[in-house]
Amino acid sequence: MSTSGSRDSASTRESARETRAGPQALPLGSVVSLSSMRSASPTHAPWVAKPTTSVDLTNHFMEVAARGGEEERSLASPGEEMQYELAHSMKAAPALPRELPSPFRAAGGRGALPQEKQFFVLTAAGKPIYSMHGPEELVMGLMGIAHTLLNYFELDGPRERLRTITTYDAHGVLQRFAFLRKKHVVLLAMTTRNEAEAELQQQLDLLYSYLVSSLSLRQMSRLFERANFDLRSFLTESDFHNLDQLCRAMCDGTHLGWTLGALECITLKHSVRQRINSIMLRATRGLAVGTLLYGMIVAPDHRLVSVLRPKGHTLHTTDLQLLFSMVENQLQLLHSSQEVWVPLCFPKFNGNGFLYCYIKFLPTDTDSASNETTLEGNMHIKPTLILISPQKSSFYDLHTCASEILDNLAVAGIMPHITAPSRFTINDIPAPLVHHFIYKSKKYVQYVMPETSSTTDWSTLMKYYSHLRSNALDSHGNPLSENVVAFARWCASSGQVQVEYCDSSEELQVEDQPSSIFSESFVEESLNMTGLSWITPSFELYLLCNNGEIPKAVVMKSARNVVGWCSRNGHKLFVSEGAVF
């Protein structure tokens, strides 16, 4: 494909993704184009391939030996040269320590991208599409290695498809490489965090789903029919910005729902939620059949308030998470008087076509003040009303519907419940010595958690939750048994993590269960913390106790109290049905 043809295609797709404005006679707020919200993407310099033969993957890619000048490097063997590239692709900034500090207090600001993790996307033919960080000339060599490895393991057919490569040292897992191969693209994750294979595969699937949401499978197949097609020339600057934000969020652990495969809800009285549902249903009565496919009201930080859906149908959690990510990364600078009309492919719903999203932010008390939200990822995401249609000409109909919904919410005095929702606290639950927990309802595919302190380092806290979750799952992400309980204890003095499994029905026999030891390093000598994972067919519970020696029987009793409390208050904690039409 020629360069000019690629640019014309990109221009065509950009014009298709512009927001639609209506006739001047209709008194609308400003309808904003997504192209005006783009951020600069990394400069795409020509990629330089180097001849490679092999690389010693047993060496830690974060531990880089001191190198001399270019003359000394030119004398290195091909294997040593690629080991140098492997290491320096992760060294755009000084390496971060692997130690887990105290999970209860933040150490500082966001800082640079974590250098202990890397994501790559390349075509099935080995051409680079995206890398999270690292000099392009070094990343190119690493992508070449990944492509060679994948092809080698597929010599005997797809049944031998490579999924992970894990290296170990005396202290356990040193580094892990996870691969996800699709029809047209290959995705690779590299980490030193001892993350489970299933978690990495889930993250790669989210990146792939984003590409599909931006292009659609039909368009991707059509594009890759061209000889020597370079997908980078077709992706927009906002696409690369969104990929950066997705990767960074997965490294920081700021979006727990991506790991759990669930949505977070606000705590709301059942009667208030029912009034919201009634208001949404009344506003849809004037719409023609087929105009509205799905709708939702989302509180700050992407916490679900209610959904508007047809009977027997719903959207996949991944599709909604991609929609929320787009709103977070591209639209947060908009004022509540502005509206957006944007096409988006929902890969889990229908990867071959686009749906059309009407997006409007709800008015808040801060609208009159200076807007401090930036595209760099402010955690306070604005409350939003989203209506989704299969018809690209339905903007005016959905605008009328949205206006009626917002007006009636304001008249009913419900808006403060949405724009400034509160969380329950750990003190609301009779669970002694529990510091924090995450409870997921498998029936509703939603989760809740108590309020945390403003000084909590959420990224570090998520590392503990990730460890707890991996203890209860196998390499494919399935529970070790139908009803599994796993205890974990972090002890800084011994530098070890003790994990014990038991049957949840045997509350008083947990002390006699066999244990296995996993190594991990810690910074604070006073750390002595217990955690629990409890997975059943109906719920998942991940619980962290206060620092100190706590008997497992006490932890189990508190866990049962948490489960009982969440079950009794499910009508407040979760969106059970929503507004069904």
UniProtKB/Swiss-Prot annotation:
Residues 1-28 are annotated as: Disordered. It is found in: Endosome, Multivesicular body membrane; Prevacuolar compartment membrane; Vacuole membrane. Keywords: Autophagy, Endosome, Membrane, Protein transport, Transport, Vacuole. GO terms for molecular function: guanyl nucleotide exchange factor inhibitor activity; guanyl-nucleotide exchange factor activity; phosphatidylinositol-3-phosphate binding; phosphatidylinositol-5-phosphate binding; phosphatidylserine binding. GO terms for cellular component: cytosol; fungal-type vacuole membrane; Mon1-Ccz1 complex; multivesicular body membrane. One of its GO terms (biological process) is vesicle docking. InterPro entries: FUZ/MON1/HPS1_longin_1 (IPR043972), FUZ/MON1/HPS1_longin_2 (IPR043971), FUZ/MON1/HPS1_longin_3 (IPR043970), Mon1 (IPR004353). It is a peripheral membrane protein. Residues 10-20 have a biased composition (Basic and acidic residues). It comes from the Eukaryota. Its main location: membrane. Belongs to the MON1/SAND family. In complex with CCZ1, is required for multiple vacuole delivery pathways including the cytoplasm to vacuole transport (Cvt), autophagy, pexophagy and endocytosis. The MON1-CCZ1 complex acts at the fusion of vesicles with the vacuole, through its regulation of the SNARE complex during the coordinated priming and docking stages of fusion, and particularly at the stage of tethering/docking. This is Vacuolar fusion protein MON1. The lineage of its organism: Eukaryota, Fungi, Dikarya, Ascomycota, Saccharomycotina.
